[in-house]
Amino acid sequence: AFKDHRYITVDGKPLFLIFDPYHFKDVRHFMELWRKMAKENGLKGIFFVAMCASTTTVKRNEDGTIRRVMPNLESSADIYNSFLELGFDGINPMGKGRAEMMYQGKYWRIARKAMQKAFPFMPALKYDYPKVMKHFFSPEDNWDNVFPTLFPQWDRTPRAGKHEGIYVNATPENFEHHIEDALQLIKNKPEQRKILFLRSWNEWGEGNYVEPDTKYGHGFLDAIRNKIKK
């Protein structure tokens, strides 16, 4: 598959995304081995991308264990650099946690989640999509080796119950504004690095999709087409 001419490449190397690298044991060795095998099979290497949150409440210790930390909402540089130093070539950030904490206040969000565990009858949190998405991208998302995420809508209550939030006012029109913000981030990047990831195409169990539905029809797909065509 890596040799297929349709495969997405960066710097001539096939792009390979790793989900949740925090919990990938020996990920550095894994990448070194795959790069070696790629070159042995006629490829230039592999362009590994870490899919990670743009802010985090956990950090990996040198022995591989995880510890809790207070999130830094002003900058994602430390997080991104930690993965680049680990051997990743690029970053695919997820700004959902950052956006929600900046919308609500990080202490309120942490307290609210604790209250939900203690009092399960509490209703699910509701987030106003256009207001939350103002905080979705961090300043470092315009780095050349960072590939931002498009986030159309969210409702994970079918899977997580009331412990997850629901995004209201997540309309195709508001999604278009979000796409425009993302396009502004990548417009001055090198051509091969003008990449956006979509989360998600059809994650129905998390209310996170752009596929046609009975409410908006092809609205979210039209929003993507309208912006990409420009």
Name each model-derived stretch.
Residues 14, 45-47, 146, 193-196:
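Residue-level recognition of the N-termini of beta-strands and the immediately preceding loop/turn
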Residues 171-212:
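Substrate-binding cleft of secreted/luminal carbohydrate-active enzymes
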Residues 29-36, 177, 181-184, 219-226:
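Alpha-helical scaffolding segments of alpha/beta enzyme cores, especially the outer helices
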Residues 199, 207-230:
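Aromatic-rich peripheral "rim/lid" segments of glycoside hydrolase catalytic domains that contact
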Residues 26-27, 31-172:
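Aromatic-lined glycan-binding groove of carbohydrate-active enzymes
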Residues 143-146, 195, 223-224, 228:
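Conserved structural scaffold segments of CAZyme catalytic domains across common CAZy folds
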